[in-house]
Structure formats: structure tokens, C-alpha cells
Amino acid sequence: MAQLCVALVAGEASGDILGSGLMRAIKARHPDVRFIGVGGPLMEAEGMSSYFPMERLAVMGLVEVLGRLRELLKRRKELIATLIDEKPDVFIGIDAPDFTLNIELKLRQAGIKTVHYVSPSVWAWRQKRVLKIREGCDLMLTLLPFEARFYEEQGVPVRFVGHPLADTIPLESDRGAARAELGLAEGPVIALMPGSRGGEVGRLGALFLDAAQRLRELVPGVRFVLPCANAARRAQVEQMLEGRDLPLTLLDGRSHQALAACDAVLIASGTATLEAMLYKRPMVVAYRLAPLTYWILKRMVKSPYVSLPNLLAQRMLVPELLQDAATSEALAQTLAPLVGDGSQQTDSFDQIHRTLRRDASNQAADAVLALLKDR
């Protein structure tokens, strides 16, 4: 079996998780493989030496990207040149579509097979991107079933592989065990999850803490857990906690334990909403963007929903409070009833979980290697 050279680029922590699982599955099928590209600590643990720190790609929001645009364009140009020189057997762009789709197009034009893992939200906004995907991508791997249907209609080769989180998160989690691990007493527990990026926590952190203070009046004996993505986020939240009296436990990472332990979640829109859904925890979703970013997106977005549970259910299964509607009072009043009974949400969560549970990393590896069998 000839050595394979697989290039991957991931732009943030969720992509690092997906990339490492895919790398592991490819190695199991084709042990003689070399990995190059850009990834985080999990991908590096699977054998990649990252060309530069993955964190340099982790920016969100139209306005926020502008401040880093020159660096991002320079890194992308250098990466394309390096990969054309290396001539990998396949390039796999993991999420980060504004960065990776252009790389895929240039590499495919240079005769390199290209795969995009995790569909951008083309079904929701900037639908013309599907033309670039069709031109630059030999195969699209989607995590969600409605995405695959969209690509089939657009004539893009696609495979729905399922979601790795649906594979790793159990269909039923042990709330009592998670509470014991985190040292949480009996009684209602709410997880606060204002996001993993600095900008998100800056816009939502204090708002969520204000909502928590109101929730203390609405839910007797409630306690809170807030998982911090890294030391910088923890420092950010600690600063916001000064002068507040909240029964709150800050965690370093451990977001899955927080979800397993809690009764309900106040959560930023993003991948974490999928995790909360897979843990069958009722939630209220909130989001605030820079005003200009929000104004632009409001005019571009075609989807009536922003959160993954609602997109998967194709209905307003979980409340979404966005921008000016996301006040501390509204968040608290909407979440409080769910602490006692969130079954209207959680019954549907179980059904969706089973649909997404398909052994994604192995499905994705099989699809990539099938693409290469004629090389």
C-alpha cells in the first residue's frame, strides 16, 4: 500500500475535534499515511505538525474579520503555495469556509483532490457560495441530513456522515455522576455557556450573569456552572463576576460534564447548542453580534432559525432570543419554566440524536479513501 499524504486545515476547536477523529479513522484503514496542514492540539496528537497555530484562523463575524484580514489573506496565499509544492493526495478543508473554500478551488485547479468536511451554511445565506463549492470541491461531507439534501439538489457530490458528537455523547447521560464529579449539591443547576471566543463572551458574559441573578429569584435554590474554554475566557468571566454574589462554579473546559450535570442551559448560538441537545438538556439560545454585523446578516440570512436544534427539527423547538430581544429579564423568564420540565424539547432531542448517530469519523474516512481509490 503506497504512502498517502493527506493535507487538512481546521480553523477552530470544533474542527480540531473533527479532524483528529478523521485522522484516526484514516490511519486505521491506511496506516502508511502522512498528515500535513493546520490543526490544533488534538490533530497534532494524531501526527500532524501544524504549519502555524490554528488559533490564528479563529475569528467570527464580518466586522471582526476585517481587523485580521491582511494576516488571513497572507497565510492563505502561503498555504496554497506550500500545498501545491507538497502535492498531497487529498486536501480536506474542515469548516472555516471563508478560509478553506478558496484553498480547495486553487488546489483542485492544480490537480489535487479536494474534500470539504462540514458544510458552510449556504442553505441559510450567501447561497451563491455553492457555485464555488461545486467548482472547487470533489466531495462535500455533511454532518446534518438537511445539508446533504441541499447539495444533491445543487449537483454537488455529497455524503451525509452523521455528527461525531452524536456518536460520542451517550443517548442517556448520568446526571448524578456528573454532579458528583463536579462537587455539585442536590437542587436545580443551570449551565451558563456564553461561547468560546473572546468576542462572544464579551457580548454575552455579563448578560448571562445578569440573567442568572434574576433566575435566583425565579428558581429557589438554583446553582450555576459556567465552563470556560481556556484561561483567557476564565479571566474574562472572573472580571465580570467582581461585585456579584452568585452561587456559581467556574470550570476549566469540562463543558460536557457541565451539560450532563445541569437541568437546563442558557447558551450562545453555535455548536454548543448541538451538544446541549445531545445531552437532552432544555435550553434557551441567545446571541448578540456587533450591530453592523447583525444588520448585514439580518438582510442576508434565508433561514428562519439560527440554532442547530431548530434547524434540525425544522421548527422553533427551542427559544431563540437574538440581539435586542436578548435581555436578562427575557432570558430568565424564558428559561425558568424549563428547569422543572423541559420535556417538550427533550423528547424531540432524543429522536434527532438517533438520526445523527452514524459513526461519522469512519463514514468520513471511507468516503475520503473511496475518492482516492482511482488515484
Curated annotation (Swiss-Prot):
It catalyses: a lipid X + a UDP-2-N,3-O-bis[(3R)-3-hydroxyacyl]-alpha-D-glucosamine = a lipid A disaccharide + UDP + H(+). Its EC number is 2.4.1.182. This is Lipid-A-disaccharide synthase. InterPro entries: Glyco_trans_19. SUPFAM superfamilies: UDP-Glycosyltransferase/glycogen phosphorylase (SSF53756). The keyword Metal-binding does not apply. It is an enzyme of class 2 (transferase). One of its GO terms (cellular component) is membrane. The keyword rRNA processing does not apply. Condensation of UDP-2,3-diacylglucosamine and 2,3-diacylglucosamine-1-phosphate to form lipid A disaccharide, a precursor of lipid A, a phosphorylated glycolipid that anchors the lipopolysaccharide to the outer membrane of the cell. It comes from the Bacteria. Pathway: Bacterial outer membrane biogenesis; LPS lipid A biosynthesis. One of its GO terms (biological process) is lipid A biosynthetic process. GO terms for molecular function: lipid-A-disaccharide synthase activity; phospholipid binding. Keywords: Glycosyltransferase, Lipid A biosynthesis, Lipid biosynthesis, Lipid metabolism, Transferase. Belongs to the LpxB family.
